[in-house]
Each structure stands twice: as structure tokens, then as C-alpha cells.
């Protein structure tokens, strides 16, 4: 039984497709010859859809002479609204004036294929590159004009034009030698490149591992080879290495600028003299400019060395260790300061708030007031406080037991010789005396003599006494 002829033109035999791919299995119907299941592997011809793109700024026919309903209020076109209009906003739009109505834009439906969507140059207009060419032509014209202004004659100018290709070729050789060299030449070592294992031939020196291409077992501290090689492809610069690097960079930059050709290896003395001369000129110019600014504006006294510069915090490599609280370990501890203002006397008070304590309330020691931010009453406030407290005492105990505040005041004003001797003999005070200045005996006598206002037996005792 013969197979049906292929109807698809692209079904030519491809010798690179294996037989198990090109031949269909026996269980697949072969009736639908138009269905090529290997179409994705065929060589497709290029279609015109790949270069299809939007025609920018294309208008559809002549413009309308009358404003139409639903058109743009600004320009009068039917293809967009006023919010999407790209024309200049008019003071009075076409909807109200009916003048200068623009034609409708052509709405194009560009259906791109798989390749056209991924073509980065699709829709590019080669005419846009013309402005880049014109810009370079203008630069070349300005260069030639600058050469003529320097006094070059037309003859020498023609000679330079003849030598231009040679100079360009020489510049290409100097600036981009890597592209002209073969890959084998690039991989060759230069004479100045010393292998790591040749830095020190001592057997006890640093070992070179050829497998990892690294220095292992860096050896003793006095090993110079181990000290030079700090890490991969890095040699620590020492001595005049930094100065040599600056001279080499100066030679390269001078050659790139085209001012002078300095070859550090061919003529190192000339390059060094030129570099030092330029450094001296730039330093003298900088000093002259600085001196002129100081003479004009002054302020030389601010440039002098001050002791405050020594106390300035600068970056250093000093190791500092912190504890769990964030403080520096080993640093002297400073006395902690309160976040609240201290020793500020307000409202004529002679003491601060909290200097006096009575009946679980803080107050002022100068007037015995327990109201914060109140005005000081002085001795009158103390006297009123004593009178209010004496009202709670028994009538018979008022003469026998003087008030605690009056006793403490008289004790402070007229100290006896005996108390003076006791204070001189006892250098340490108890915790009770430090906190309140009251002894235990005085506190006990005060508790016995005072009368509690909420005592239910107080009224009963007074009735019995009467």
C-alpha cells in the first residue's frame, strides 16, 4: 500500500531529521495531509508581516468642516477624546469655535507574529540616523576650522589630510592591540610577570599548590614571599611601587590626551622630569590661587592649627568591644543623670518638689505643702500644718507632747552640748535617721499620743473621760 503524496510544499525530505521523528507511528491517522506535525522544524520563508509597523502621523482623508458629536473637544478629531489629545491645548476648543478641525487618525491593527514581536529593529526608521551623521560632520568641520585658526596653511593642512589614515592606523594599534593579537599571544606571560613559586626558593618558605594555584602554609612571619602575596592576583605594594604606578598612569594619560608621547620604559628619566615639573606648576598655581582668595576675602586665622582638631573623632582601626547594654567594656562608668530637670525652684519655694514626705504624700520641705506647683507659704504653711495636725491629738497630750516638727526645728536651732558630743562620737547614722531624721523612740511616742480620726473608740474614750 503506497503512501499519499504530500500536499504541503515544505515537506521535502530532510536528511538531518532521524527516521523515528520523520515517520509517523502506525497508530496515527494519515488522512489529514495538510496537518504537518513537523512544521516547527521546517525552514519557513520570510513573510512581509515581520516588517509591518504603525504608520506614524497618518490621517484619514480630509478634515471635517463641522464639529461632530463625540469628537475631541480640543482638536475635533473623532479617534480620541480630549484627555488623550496630543495637540496643543487651545483656549477655546474646536467644540465651541468650530475652526481648525483636525483630520481623524488612522487606527491601524498591526498583528505581529512570533518573530516580529521579538525583532528589536522592527519599526526602526533608518532616516533617523541621519542627524547623528550630520552631528559628526559638524564636529569634523569645527576641528578643521580650529586647525586653520592656529595658523596652519592650506598646504600643511593637505599634508595632514594625507597622513590622517596613517595616524588613525597607528592610534588603533596603540589603543586596541588586544583585538589584533591572536588568542595564543594574549595568553603568553610577559617578562615582568613572576610566578608565585619563584618568589622565594627556600624549602621552608610558603608552599605553592599547583592544583588550586594558591599559596598554602604561609610560613614564618619573616617570610617575605608570604607577606607579598596576600591573596589571589594581589601583590602588596611596598617601597616605590606606588610612585611607579603614579608615573605609569601619568604617561598613559598624557599619551591619551595627545599632548606629548611619554614612554616610561623607553625613557623613564624624561617622563619623571615632566611629571615632577607639571606637579610643581600645578602646586604653585594652587598656592597662588589660594593666596589671592585669602587676600581678597581674608580668613587666614581659621586655617591655622587649633587644639580642637586633635579632639576630633576620626576613623581609626582601634578595636572596641561592647557589652550587652551597649556600653564600651573597660570604660569608666559615669554617674547617670536624670532625664528630669533638677534643682529648679518654682513659685518662691526654697526647696524642690519631693523634698518632704508625710502620710504617703510628697511635698515641699519649705512650707509642708503637698500640692504640686503651688505657691510657697513659708513659715505660715508650716504653722498651719502643725495646727491641723494638733487637732487630732488628745487635749491632755497637747502640752505634754510638743509637735514633732517644732521639736525637730528647736533641736536643729539649739543643739545641746550632749547631742553635740553624741554626734561627734557616732560617725555613722542609722537608716531611719538618714531617711527622715526621726529616731525610733520619737516615732513610738508620736504613735501613742496621736489620735486616729477613723478610730471608732476615740469618741467612746472621750465620753468616759468627761
Curated annotation (Swiss-Prot):
Keywords: Metal-binding, mRNA processing, mRNA splicing, Nucleus, Spliceosome, Zinc, Zinc-finger
Coiled coil region boundaries: none
Pfam families from the UniProt entry: Slu7
Gene Ontology cellular component list: spliceosomal complex
Membrane-traversing stretches: none
Record GO biological process: mRNA splicing, via spliceosome; RNA splicing
Subunit: Associated with the spliceosome.
Family: Belongs to the SLU7 family.
Protein name, entry field: Pre-mRNA-splicing factor slu7
Species per Swiss-Prot/TrEMBL record: Emericella nidulans (strain FGSC A4 / ATCC 38163 / CBS 112.46 / NRRL 194 / M139)
Amino acid at each position: 500500500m503506497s503512501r499519499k503524496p504530500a500536499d504541503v510544499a515544505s515537506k521535502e525530505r530532510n536528511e538531518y531529521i532521524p527516521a523515528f521523528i520523520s515517520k509517523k507511528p502506525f497508530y496515527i491517522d494519515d488522512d489529514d495531509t495538510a496537518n504537518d506535525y513537523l512544521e516547527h522544524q521546517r525552514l519557513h520563508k520570510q513573510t512581509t508581516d515581520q516588517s509591518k509597523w504603525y504608520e506614524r502621523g497618518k490621517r484619514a482623508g480630509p478634515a471635517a468642516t463641522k464639529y461632530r458629536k463625540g469628537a475631541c473637544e480640543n482638536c475635533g478629531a473623532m479617534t480620541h477624546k480630549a484627555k488623550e489629545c496630543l495637540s496643543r491645548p487651545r483656549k477655546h476648543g474646536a467644540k465651541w469655535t468650530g475652526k481648525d478641525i483636525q483630520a481623524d487618525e488612522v487606527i491601524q491593527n498591526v498583528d505581529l507574529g512570533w518573530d516580529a514581536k521579538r525583532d528589536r529593529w522592527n519599526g526602526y526608521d533608518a532616516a533617523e540616523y541621519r542627524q547623528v551623521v550630520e552631528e559628526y560632520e559638524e564636529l569634523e568641520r569645527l576641528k578643521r576650522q580650529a586647525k586653520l585658526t592656529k595658523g596652519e596653511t592650506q598646504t600643511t593642512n593637505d599634508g595632514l589630510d594625507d597622513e590622517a589614515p596613517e595616524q588613525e592606523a597607528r592610534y588603533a594599534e596603540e589603543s586596541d592591540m588586544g583585538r589584533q593579537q591572536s588568542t595564543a599571544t594574549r595568553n603568553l606571560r610577559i617578562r615582568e610577570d613572576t610566578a608565585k613559586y619563584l618568589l622565594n626558593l627556600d624549602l621552608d618558605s610558603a608552599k605553592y599548590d599547583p592544583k588550586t594555584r594558591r599559596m598554602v602554609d604561609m610560613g614564618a612571619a619573616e617570610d617575605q614571599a608570604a607577606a607579598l602575596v596576600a591573596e589571589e592576583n594581589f601583590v602588596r605594594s611596598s617601597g616605590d611601587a606606588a610612585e611607579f604606578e603614579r608615573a605609569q598612569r601619568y604617561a598613559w594619560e598624557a599619551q591619551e590626551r595627545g599632548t606629548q608621547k611619554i614612554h616610561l620604559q623607553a625613557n623613564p628619566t624624561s617622563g619623571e622630569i615632566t611629571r615632577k615639573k607639571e606637579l610643581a606648576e600645578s602646586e604653585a598655581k594652587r598656592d597662588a590661587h589660594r593666596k589671592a582668595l585669602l587676600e581678597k576675602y581674608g580668613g587666614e586665622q581659621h586655617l591655622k592649627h587649633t587644639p580642637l582638631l586633635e579632639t576630633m573623632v576620626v576613623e581609626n582601626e582601634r578595636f572596641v568591644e561592647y557589652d550587652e547594654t551597649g556600653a564600651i567594656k573597660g570604660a569608666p562608668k559615669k554617674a547617670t543623670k536624670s532625664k528630669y530637670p533638677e534643682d529648679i525652684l518654682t513659685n518662691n519655694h526654697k526647696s524642690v518638689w519631693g523634698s518632704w514626705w508625710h502620710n504617703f504624700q510628697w511635698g515641699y520641705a519649705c512650707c509642708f505643702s503637698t500640692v504640686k506647683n503651688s505657691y510657697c507659704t513659708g513659715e505660715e504653711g508650716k504653722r498651719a500644718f502643725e495646727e491641723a495636725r494638733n487637732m487630732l491629738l488628745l487635749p491632755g497630750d497637747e502640752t505634754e507632747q510638743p509637735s514633732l516638727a517644732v521639736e525637730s526645728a528647736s533641736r536643729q536651732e539649739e543643739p545641746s552640748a550632749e547631742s553635740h558630743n553624741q554626734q561627734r562620737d557616732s560617725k555613722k547614722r542609722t537608716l531611719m535617721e538618714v531617711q527622715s531624721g526621726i529616731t525610733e523612740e520619737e516615732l513610738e511616742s508620736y504613735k501613742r499620743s496621736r489620735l486616729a480620726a477613723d478610730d471608732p473608740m476615740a469618741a467612746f474614750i472621750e465620753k468616759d473621760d468627761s
